[in-house]
Amino acid sequence: MRTLTAYNEDNFRQIEQYNGISVVRFSAPWCPPCQASEEMFSQFADRLDRDIQVGKVNVDQAPVLTTKYEIWGLPSVLIFHEGQLVKR
């Protein structure tokens, strides 16, 4: 099973500077839909090409990112290409 990198304000620059595709899931431990879909996201991540960065953000630990990317519903999956948000 693929390990999902936990991102926060300190290391999210890795996503913003990556020259490929990144898929990032924003969620929270208190969110029932987040918990219910966590395994499905892990299985999805396992099927992606290894050149695609995959990670997760706990919104409670990353309020600046949550605001910056306008995360209003959980879970939210954002797709970045060369550091730019292209799809949510």
Model-based region annotation:
Residues 13, 32, 42, 86:
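Nucleotide phosphate-binding site architecture
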Residues 1-22:
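N-terminal leader/targeting and pre-domain segments
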Residues 66-74, 84-88:
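Thiol/disulfide oxidoreductase modules built on the thioredoxin-like
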Residues 4-8, 26, 38-64, 74, ...:
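Thiol-based oxidoreductase modules, predominantly thioredoxin-like and allied folds used
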Residues 30-38:
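Short, thiol/selenol-centered motifs that function as redox-active sites or metal-ligating centers
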